[in-house]
């Protein structure tokens, strides 16, 4: 089958050795950097700049980069620990790179990034873009997939919008006739 995959993350993210890493502020290491209302183009430009910077750091450090990871503690809290990763350029990918790689391996994925601010209703332009993506999935008999960071807010918004579109498509005429 085919997949219409929509990434709803607003935060810049890089995949390093297959694991996602996000930009964080030094004084708020457990909180994503928020850029409310940022466009997809800006997020992807930031990701490409971070990718260039991290690749340059790896060249300067003989293939090593310093990252930070979250480690769960027994009390339910998290600690931030430094981790040295050994990398090559091909190990440092943007989300778009990841999906292009998946497509190049023969998977039929129609990927798009639609940046949505977490825990806020999508603005009309974003709603329209999501409507187009869902309609494309319906028209091409594809699966519709949404992702964000945690799968609680933005992914849920995408799924609710998809459900509304499918419901109106399937039952809209019947609903109109009942009134």
Predicted regions and their residues:
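Cysteine-based protein phosphatase catalytic domain of the PTP/DSP
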Residues: 1-143, 160-179
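Short glycine/threonine-rich catalytic loop with a Thr-x-Gly-x-Asp
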Residues: 149
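Glycine-rich nucleophile elbow surrounding the catalytic serine of serine-hydrolase chemistry
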Residues: 152-159
């Amino acid at each position: 089958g085919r997949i219409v995959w929509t990434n709803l993350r607003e935060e810049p993210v890089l995949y390093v050795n297959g694991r996602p890493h996000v930009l964080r502020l030094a004084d708020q290491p457990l909180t994503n950097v928020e850029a409310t209302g940022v466009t997809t183009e800006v997020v992807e430009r930031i990701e490409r700049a971070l990718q260039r910077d991290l690749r340059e750091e790896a060249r300067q450090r003989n293939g090593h980069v310093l990252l930070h990871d979250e480690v769960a503690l027994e009390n339910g809290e998290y600690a931030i620990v430094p981790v040295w990763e050994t990398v090559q350029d091909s190990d440092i990918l943007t989300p778009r790179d990841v999906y292009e790689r998946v497509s190049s391996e023969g998977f039929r994925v129609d990927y798009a990034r639609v940046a949505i601010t977490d825990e806020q209703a999508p603005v009309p332009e974003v709603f329209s873009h999501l409507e187009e993506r869902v309609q494309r999935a319906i028209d091409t008999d594809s699966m519709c997939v949404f992702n964000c960071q945690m799968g609680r807010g933005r992914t849920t918004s995408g799924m609710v919008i998809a459900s509304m579109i499918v419901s109106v498509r399937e039952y809209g005429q019947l609903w109109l006739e009942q009134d």
